[in-house]
């Protein structure tokens, strides 16, 4: 890599003295620390404070004396080292602004924003920060004796100085107060401390005269001390590199480690480097490369459904694709776009239509697609798997080669080369370790590299080595054929060899074989059985036979555990697999999510998965018949009985290891299938062009107006809106109220539309009430006659305009964006709902960009209902491949990406690039002036003084996918740089253009000599004659290229034809409108599985009339209950009243209109809802299901347990785990009331504190009318409430508000306690003269936070627990009403603790 390229990233850094606190706010790391043992419970929490814990925490103030001494000695040394000359730093040693962006900002690495410079005042502002020492030393009496700080202030001020650092950034006074305070401090600096008269030998009058003339020598010491401080700062700057300032985890997160730099500068595609990182030392021979092509072809062919005549071309295509990947180093998009001819099998045939039509072409080409773009990713994945397979095989061969000098094994010789999977290689490795454990131990003495593997093998097989060396092994040989020979018999790999019976009975033979190791015949027989069973177990051919049968005849069944009996109820997602049985491997292959659900339930201990053979009995019998002798006698029967015992021993061991392998392989296969489905679904979301207004060309960016009511009622709560132009600029934003009835607001919206003329109105929200907003806006558009832009109607050839379209927007990206650090950085002054509307507008203008901006957060999207059963790393990788395909299909305007951060988010997905190389690209272009005029200059242009930005191989990958808009007025602008044509094919494109224009070689030469190489294509565009390329017969030209130059360019020529007519044409599908079901799910959170007809649901009564009632379901939709569906005996008003929560059966659900019909009739309620599962009659254990229902019923009777129901809309019949699962997707502060495990005089309230943190509040009920009624008095610790609503509002919601207040504080860190402590340490390393503190959430004790603080660079990090209580915070038994009071209280408490410590130590 050239030096000029390496200059693009600076390795070392000089830190600015005035670095803002905010530059470290997002940094976090890990350091294991001891947590305070705050009392808590996973079910219901106690409210008592742990006094012992408080004592332990206070003990944390004791500072190590060595630490104090070191700090003091260090200060003394620094004070002695004065007047050191300042050294200039080299440019490459500086931590430049862009590097700091990479570390400190939570926005994309390539986004560059000008940083505001901190203004420095005159000497008044430049006071010297207090030197840091140990906590105990701050208040030491020795300060008065040894104070040489150069200040005139008394030493008692040291305590206040230390404390000032804590207050530094918190709630400062206004500017005027601060200015006066600083001036007062400045004036106080040269204050005379006075001299001791007794030590001078002068009288008082003489001293006064001397002071008046000369001063006391300290008047200007503050200025000298300031100079000393600056020199000290310069010394700390020297030789600082990134790893000196930031934690390794932070550097890794920001891609700034040494390994990241190697990837960044190495001229190989970034994704290739990451995928092959584990195999970078693997060298493949040409034979192995050919073997890999065959291996991949054999794995892919079964799923391709190609005719037999295409098998050969398919194998060649796979080999060629591997060559492109491995040898040429080009990525999938490049191969698919520029080597497409190798993915197609073209066959030239005579045209049968020529007989009737002489003008018809003589030949036609029949093309068959061999490999799709998805197949290319599969080949790439299998390439990595083959490398893993090859590496393991090489290691096995190396071990065997060392053994071959002493022994030869036909099984290994034959089967190593036959192995086709990792499983088979592992079988051979196990066989080698078992069969040759003694030999491997001998090798270990001479080969330390094999020590680990050999030790493992020797330890496991020591007892069998003892048998192998003893006489007992002769009994093993007498039992008959070897396990390998038996496996050959079963597999019919050669002529059958039968076992021969010894002439003696087994017992008699055993008696003759006794020795010191096995002194009795019985011990000899037992040892022989164990030995032969182990040989069968270790036999690779036997395992192959078992594995083949389990894959072909295996059946999978589930058996619930005792834990799963009650936990997996009918509402649990695992109920679908609780009683499954007799599922074949083929059945699970078509429903991969089912097996993944089984595996997850098994991991949680809820079920056991049993894999067995459908033909188990026949399989065992076949195994025995091929092992038994064919003789008929008592002797033969005795020997066959021994053989049967051996088979029984070996069978169970073999089944265990094979079943484990089958389950692992099946899980991998099911994951691959589900990942493929996720990729396809995500690709569909990406494959959307911007919304296209009528009359516009697809791909045109629309002007958009977006509105949202969020969670609120649109008739009562504000409706946020944003108007965005076609360039993505926010023109206006604001709020409306009550667009349904307030005419002034309706007119304001109409005026906004007329003023800004949007092409479309988009609406979305978080609740079913959004449906009302949609209806209101649609009615307003119709009533006011609001129309979209004019367009040319092709039917009438006249201009017309239609009513403005109102559409519902998919808001999955906007929900993630509105509160994200990126959104706050983009729009710090806007509220979350406005940012939400901005994201909605951007989504309509380009969905792909919004998805790309998510980065790794893309896995937070609900792509597939079962994606939670997939490994997140695998899911992310597959989703990224879909993004890579789409980004390279659409292309990236590199100059737009340099100016627009949203476009720059696409760069990591361009072929050849990645996050690291995208950073390199942006930085390199900036160094070259910030603008790219041609694709070629990215690899350097010395004549124009352009440094190389990318290496040749990476450039070759990405060149055609980075386009540059053609400027006809710029003679250096090449129109081909604005097309999908690769620079390697520019000459071909120019030849096509010349032929289309009818220019001969002389005309071409004259044109190019005068106007450059791009002159011909420029002329084609200038003359507007692109359509002439359609007249060319490109097939003949393609044949000529293949015949004369061995270049297959048919598809490339077609691409050239298309690009010369419409450069970078929009190839995405049109913007996709949401379906009725998708809108319903988005606004209610319910799908057809979670809410459907027949379910019994909770309903809150809103209106009661004489003949019907209106209710509202938990999901927000309205329901209607007719009077005859309530009761035949009573009036509806006697049964229902407003505010009542009732149970009702859902009779009809209109998802389009968000309305439902319900019934409360007894006969309807008595019929429970049964979820239908798609399985065969013989695949569900109905008998076991009925038995379990009866068992649970009996248990409930015996324990007196009954399902409690509370008449409240927030009540759910959940346990703690179900409550947490339910609240997991809800916003923080949401609440569930549920039964308590403590009995019917308790209730439990679970509320969401933060993501993944839930508090369970125990509510004691007093003054109950009966066992199941809610108590008139509800007690939570020392708090008492009159009803549930009061408890929710004044207790839970009050605490949630305090939690939100603390988490919005700028001193709050989002990471764990370990990460926060790491952040404090990092901050202090970068700012050694400051003190700081931060809050973080205590995830182990919901409702608590940690207040972590570090008083000086050398002091330890301390942590105090902060408890959230209703309307306040509690710290050390003291309560504080808000965060500001809490912070000030902490500082006073800290000062008090330090004074206590000092007084106690005197």
Curated annotation (Swiss-Prot):
The annotated regions of Acidic residues compositional bias extend over 10-28, 40-52, 62-75, 90-102, 161-176
CDD domains on file: SH2_Cterm_SPT6_like (cd09928), SH2_Nterm_SPT6_like (cd09918)
- The residues forming the signal peptide are none
Q: Where is the S1 motif domain?
A: 1094-1161
Q: Domain of life, per the record?
A: Eukaryota
Cellular compartment(s):
Nucleus; Chromosome
GO CC annotation, single: euchromatin
Gene Ontology MF terms in the entry: DNA binding; histone binding; nucleosome binding; transcription antitermination factor activity, DNA binding
InterPro entries xref list: HHH_9, NA-bd_OB-fold, RNaseH-like_sf, RuvA_2-like, S1_domain, SH2_dom_sf, Spt6-like_S1, Spt6_acidic_N_dom
Q: Where is the composition biased (Basic and acidic residues)?
A: 123-135, 177-199
Q: Taking every annotated instance into account, which residue ranges of this chain make up the domain SH2?
A: 1209-1306
Annotated region Disordered: the residues are 1-199
Q: What does this protein do?
A: Histone H3-H4 chaperone that plays a role in maintenance of chromatin structure during RNA polymerase II transcription elongation thereby repressing transcription initiation from cryptic promoters. Mediates the reassembly of nucleosomes onto the promoters of at least a selected set of genes during repression; the nucleosome reassembly is essential for transcriptional repression. Essential for viability.
Hey, which family's this protein in? Answer: Belongs to the SPT6 family.
Query: What is the designated name of this protein?
Result: Transcription elongation factor spt-6
Q: Which organism is it from?
A: Neurospora crassa (strain ATCC 24698 / 74-OR23-1A / CBS 708.71 / DSM 1257 / FGSC 987)
